[in-house]
C-alpha cells in the first residue's frame, strides 16, 4: 500500500505519498502542486517535463494546459560538487545540518516514529 503523510501549515497543506511498494505503480519520480488557481506537475522528474494547468494566465504562462521541457541533467553532480567545496572549506553547504535534521525528524514524526 502507498505510504502517506499530511503536513498542515497556516495557508497550505502538503500531502506526501510514496507508491514504490504499490502494485502497478509508475517507476518514475514525480512532484505535483495543486493550488486554487491550477496545478503544476513535474513528471517524470528526469528528464524534466513540467505541465501547468491554470485557471487564469499567470506571469508568462497562459490559461489552460501547457508543457515545458527542461534539458537533461545528471542528478547529484551539482550536489557532490557543492559537498566537495564544503569539505575543502571553500563554501558552506546550502542546507544547514539543522535544516537536514528538521527534515529527518518531520519524516519520522509523519511516519509515527517520533
Regions found by a protein language model. Name each.
Residues 70-77, 94:
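Short, well-ordered coil↔helix boundary/capping segments
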Amino acid at each position: 500500500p502507498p505510504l502517506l503523510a499530511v503536513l498542515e501549515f497556516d495557508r497550505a497543506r502538503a500531502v506526501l505519498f510514496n507508491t514504490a511498494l504499490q502494485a502497478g505503480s509508475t517507476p518514475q519520480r514525480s512532484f505535483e502542486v495543486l493550488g486554487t488557481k491550477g496545478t503544476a506537475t513535474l513528471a517524470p522528474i528526469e528528464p524534466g517535463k513540467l505541465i501547468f494547468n491554470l485557471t487564469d494566465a499567470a506571469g508568462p504562462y497562459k490559461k489552460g494546459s501547457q508543457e515545458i521541457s527542461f534539458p537533461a541533467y545528471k542528478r547529484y553532480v551539482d550536489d557532490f560538487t557543492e559537498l566537495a567545496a564544503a569539505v575543502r572549506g571553500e563554501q558552506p553547504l546550502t542546507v544547514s545540518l539543522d535544516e537536514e535534521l528538521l527534515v529527518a525528524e518531520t519524516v519520522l514524526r509523519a511516519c509515527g516514529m517520533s
